[in-house]
């Protein structure tokens, strides 16, 4: 099993809270798509012939691509990689980019899962977040998606907003439950260092974030999701039984995946790769690679991260460095252990000590159990038989618990 992720870095505009790599312009779209197609073909051996069961268009705003452009990418992937029966094909979308005609086109292409960035069903929240859609369009696009034939729909909501309160957050959840959607991703508003909202708060232009409000909303979310039959299967994700995101779950289970596009990451079981976080440099790299074999250099744990350590067919870029656009790190056994802890602790499946002993060795499972005992005694971690996991309340402190379990 394997997955494919395509990073589409374009947006209509930059949302105030966003810390992801994206461009609020489409002027490089045509050049980018050619580069993306080059990478898809160039790296066809990366997954070693594994069957691809999930394809995920993330961003940015993938729904800024036309139906024809998405169709060309899917056709290329189908002709380049072995695709499983009934693969999960997800496309992230923003309400302001959607129409009934567009959604019908996606469905006809074989896209069978939507992840829609609603964020809130209230205009005051949407304005605070600098979203382009309004509350009417937020609900209209869900109606359209159902009319177009989609039944696997996820939406994003943000809680802990200073423009909201407990009553309004409950109303947001009321609307979600009324649509009977199978999946919800809900995130506390966080202040990313490079986000517009962070600067606005620092300058006193908008209301600051209150952590107590976020905690209140999280508790409401967990309680109401359980009451309505949703499984809290990952810190920020809730689903009806069997309707979890197969693609995202593959990350948490260590399934190999290839990431294409600027800033995209890949993992093949032994190493991680990541692409340069610049559309222009990415396009330059793929253009050069199409004319000359691309060599990806390996960096081991402990190596300096200051300079790229791979060969490149590119001429020198800024500062005299050369970059082929892809960098690679070979993971040590200790790094594999830490990644397993970090990823699995986020989920309701938790850490499987038997799996750890079998796949990583007894020294790792013994160490993990030893580190876990004081955390269990303190009520910060739970254990059932060979599984270590976090309850809803314990998930609030997942990062701190993971750090104490790390090698």
Task: Show the residue positions of the predicted features.
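Glycine-biased, low-complexity coil/linker segments
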Residues: 295-298, 306, 318-320
